[in-house]
Swiss-Prot record:
UniProt entry keywords in alphabetical sequence: Acetylation, ADP-ribosylation, Chaperone, Cytoplasm, Cytoskeleton, Disulfide bond, Isopeptide bond, Nucleus, Phosphoprotein, RNA-binding, Ubl conjugation
Full protein name: Nucleophosmin
Organism lineage string: Eukaryota, Metazoa, Chordata, Craniata, Vertebrata
Residue numbers covered by motif Nuclear localization signal: 152-157, 192-198
Region (Interaction with NOP2): 188-216
UniProt modified residues of type Phosphoserine: S4, S10, S43, S70, S125, S137, S139, S227, S242, S243, S254, S260
Modification sites for ADP-ribosylserine: S208
Chain's gene name: NPM1
Region span, Necessary for interaction with APEX1: 1-117
Recorded family membership: Belongs to the nucleoplasmin family.
Quaternary structure and partners: Decamer formed by two pentameric rings associated in a head-to-head fashion. Disulfide-linked dimers under certain conditions. The SWAP complex consists of NPM1, NCL, PARP1 and SWAP70. Interacts with NSUN2 and SENP3. Interacts with the methylated form of RPS10. Interacts (via N-terminal domain) with APEX1; the interaction is RNA-dependent and decreases in hydrogen peroxide-damaged cells. Interacts with isoform 1 of NEK2. Interacts with ROCK2 and BRCA2. Interacts with RPGR. Interacts with CENPW. Interacts with EIF2AK2/PKR. Interacts with CEBPA (isoform 4).
C-alpha cells in the first residue's frame, strides 16, 4: 500500500503553513477548509497556558471525524500552571474539519502547529516540459541527415594536418642541414655521417608520435556524438490519468497487501482525484459503486 501511494502521490507538492490559536472557556476554535481538490492536514505541536492563566486544571479537547465518518472527541492535553504549564504533542495530525475547545478551565490556552497542504503541480510547468521534449525531438531529427558527412570531413582535416606537420618537419630539417653545412667546414668528413645516422631515428620518432596523436581522437568523438543523438531521439512521454480498470487493479492490490480504502464517499472521491488524477465524474461514481461492493 505504501509503495503504491508513493508512486501515485508523486505529482503532489507539499506546502507547510504556520498555525496557531487561543482557547478560552467561552471561545472554541473551528478549523475548516474550502471544498477543493487539495488534501489538508492539521499537525499540532504544542499546547501551553498563556500569561494570566489561573493555577487550575485545564483540559483541551479536539473534535473531528473518525475513519467511519462519525464525529469523535479526544483529549489532547491536561495542563496546570504549577505542575505542567505546557505539553508537546510532537506532530499530532488531524484531518479537517476540526474543533478545538477548552473543556475545563478558564484559559487562556495557546495551541501551535502546522497546516499541511498537498498541492498539485501547475499545468504550466507540465506544458513547458512537453515543449522542451518537442524541441529536443525536432533538433534530433534535423541533425540526423548530416551526421554521415562529419566523419569524412574529419578524415580530410586529419590528412591536411599530417601534411602540414610533414612540411614543418621538412623545413626544420632544411634549417638543421644548413647549420650542419656551416659546421662541417670546420670538422672532419666523418662527422656528417654520424649526424645523419643520429637524426634519422629522431625524425621517424617525431613523425610516428605526431601520427599517433592525430589519429586517436577521431574515434571517441564520433561515438560520443552518436550516443548524444540517440538520447535526443528518445524523449520522455508524460503519464496521463489511469483507466478505471487500472485503478481498480491498483486498489485491489493494495487491499490484498493489507491496506484499506476510505469508506466515506467524499473522502473516497478526494482520494481518487489526488492519487490517480481522475476527473471523469462517471468513472469516479463507477469506482465508488465498486468500492461499496467490496
Amino acid at each position: 500500500m505504501e509503495d503504491s501511494m508513493d508512486m501515485d502521490m508523486s505529482p503532489l507538492r507539499p506546502q507547510n503553513y504556520l498555525f496557531g490559536c487561543e482557547l478560552k472557556a467561552d471561545r472554541d476554535y473551528h478549523f475548516k477548509v474550502d471544498n477543493d481538490e487539495n488534501e489538508h492536514q492539521l499537525s499540532l505541536r504544542t499546547v501551553s497556558l498563556g500569561a494570566g492563566a489561573k493555577d487550575e486544571l485545564h483540559v483541551v479537547e479536539a473534535e473531528a471525524m473518525n475513519y467511519e465518518g462519525s464525529p469523535i472527541k479526544v483529549t489532547l492535553a491536561t495542563l496546570k500552571m504549577s505542575v505542567q504549564p505546557t505539553v508537546s504533542l510532537g506532530g499530532f495530525e488531524i484531518t479537517p474539519p476540526v474543533v478545538l475547545r477548552l473543556k475545563c478551565g478558564s484559559g487562556p490556552v495557546h495551541i501551535s502547529g502546522q497546516h499541511l497542504v498537498a498541492v498539485e503541480e501547475d499545468a504550466e510547468s507540465e506544458e513547458e516540459e512537453e515543449e522542451e521534449v518537442k524541441l529536443l525531438s525536432i533538433s534530433g531529427k534535423r541533425s540526423a541527415p548530416g551526421s554521415g558527412s562529419k566523419v569524412p570531413q574529419k578524415k580530410v582535416k586529419l590528412a591536411a594536418d599530417e601534411d602540414e606537420d610533414d612540411d614543418d618537419d621538412d623545413d626544420d630539417d632544411d634549417d638543421e642541414d644548413d647549420d650542419d653545412d656551416d659546421f662541417d667546414e670546420e670538422v672532419e668528413e666523418k662527422a656528417p655521417v654520424k649526424k645523419s645516422v643520429r637524426d634519422t631515428p629522431a625524425k621517424n620518432a617525431q613523425k610516428s608520435n605526431q601520427n599517433g596523436k592525430d589519429s586517436k581522437p577521431s574515434t571517441p568523438r564520433s561515438k560520443g556524438q552518436e550516443s548524444f543523438k540517440k538520447q535526443e531521439k528518445t524523449p520522455k512521454t508524460p503519464r496521463g490519468p489511469s483507466s478505471v480498470e487500472d485503478i481498480k487493479a491498483k486498489m485491489q492490490a493494495s487491499i490484498e497487501k493489507g491496506g484499506s480504502l476510505p469508506k466515506v464517499e467524499a473522502k473516497f472521491i478526494n482520494y481518487v482525484k489526488n492519487c490517480f488524477r481522475m476527473t471523469d465524474q462517471e468513472a469516479i461514481q463507477d469506482l465508488w459503486q465498486w468500492r461499496k461492493s467490496l
